[in-house]
């Protein structure tokens, strides 16, 4: 019996990568909060996941290591790869509050919206390369290059160095996602990234520009500024968190449209639905599937009594398909307007790059639909990749004529 049929979680199995939702549904029907044989907790219901994300009795910092047994390689690997200090993702207040306030000053909605013309230009350039081609892989030609180029432009990185940024990001993402076979390469990439960004920071201190690193250098809150280590951690986090997840939003979102041609036709007819469609893609097939917290005190969550220090894994993707929250949750509807999904998390750790990811998705998918009216899937199935934390399409062959 497969893991999908039995309702168990085998994160790296072919069945789970191709379609984890039947297993999530089966697990949720057994219990919205349940203990695993390994001794930690899974949370699958929308309300319960929302509480996990917003209730400050659950924290981030205490959870690293937690009660999940890790090998030495696992313990020493991922947490060294986002700069030389903890990032916002691994901190609780008050340090998280201070750091997020400082970084937010350089990442305002206005700053993100100013990126729209540039993102449109990048998308146009990438799609120009597909003109006249009857067939192409959406992932390698658009979904993967786009976020790396956008992030490099935000940071003020020269075009000639984009390839290096892509290599650094790919190596670090693989390890942070659970692939420890490439740990040495990820460490080298981290060292190269730190050295490179340190030089850029030093340059921006002397000669500020209109870019994100200059804004990080200038950011100040109550007389406090970001240390160099904090800036390095923030840049590395942006590079890692903004690369794979946005790429998967574009590729998996397009796959959802192509598998639901009536919804794609409606979106073509009503392009004003594009913001709603992007949020539906995030709800229906969002790239981030899980997040982890640790109970900072004894907590009752749903019907479960969770003890202080116990690790709790929230399955965001299961919450986003909870029938108690969404009517007909396994149906993809571009007009659903599901802005309350938890694909970006919630609470103090809500994704700082959510507005940018939405904007990239809107520009990429909207332009693709406008320029390629005859898009359709090839007969072969798409290829899926990822881990228990992040999942997405890694190859998607399309025909355009």
Q: What residue ranges belong to the model's regions?
A:
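Cytochrome P450
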Residues: 1-401
């Amino acid at each position: 019996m497969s893991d999908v049929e039995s309702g168990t979680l085998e994160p790296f199995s072919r069945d789970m990568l191709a379609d984890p939702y039947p297993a999530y549904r089966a697990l949720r029907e057994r219990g919205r909060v349940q203990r695993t044989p390994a001794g930690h907790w899974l949370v699958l219901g929308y309300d319960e996941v929302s509480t996990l994300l917003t209730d400050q009795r659950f924290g981030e910092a205490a959870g690293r290591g937690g009660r999940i047994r890790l090998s030495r390689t696992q313990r020493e690997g991922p947490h060294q790869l986002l700069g030389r200090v903890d990032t916002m993702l691994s901190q609780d207040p008050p340090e998280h509050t201070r750091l997020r306030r400082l970084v937010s000053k350089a990442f305002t909605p206005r700053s993100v919206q100013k990126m729209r013309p540039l993102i449109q230009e990048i998308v146009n350039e990438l799609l120009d390369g597909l003109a006249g081609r009857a067939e192409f892989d959406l992932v390698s030609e658009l979904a993967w290059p786009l976020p790396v180029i956008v992030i490099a432009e935000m940071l003020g990185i020269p075009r000639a160095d984009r390839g290096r940024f892509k290599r650094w990001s790919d190596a670090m993402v693989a390890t942070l996602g659970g692939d420890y076979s490439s740990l040495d390469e990820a460490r080298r990439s981290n060292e190269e990234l730190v050295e490179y960004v340190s030089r850029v920071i030093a340059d921006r201190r002397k000669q500020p520009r209109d870019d994100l690193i200059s804004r990080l250098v200038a950011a100040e809150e109550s007389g406090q500024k970001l240390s160099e280590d904090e800036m390095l951690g923030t840049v590395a986090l942006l590079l890692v968190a903004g690369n794979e997840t946005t790429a998967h939003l574009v590729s998996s979102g397009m796959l959802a449209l192509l598998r639901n041609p009536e919804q794609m036709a409606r979106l073509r007819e009503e392009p004003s639905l594009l913001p709603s469609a992007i949020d539906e893609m995030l709800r229906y097939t969002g790239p981030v599937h899980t997040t982890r917290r640790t109970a900072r005190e004894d907590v009752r969550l749903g019907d479960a009594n969770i003890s202080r220090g116990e690790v709790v894994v929230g399955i965001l993707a299961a919450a986003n398909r909870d029938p108690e929250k969404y009517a007909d949750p396994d149906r993809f509807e571009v007009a659903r307007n599901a802005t309350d999904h938890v694909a970006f998390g919630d609470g103090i750790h809500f994704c700082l790059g959510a507005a940018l990811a939405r904007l990239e998705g809107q520009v990429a998918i909207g332009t693709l639909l406008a320029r390629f009216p005859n898009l359709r899937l090839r007969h072969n199935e798409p290829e899926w990749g990822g881990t228990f934390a992040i999942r997405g399409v890694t190859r998607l062959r399309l025909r355009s004529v």
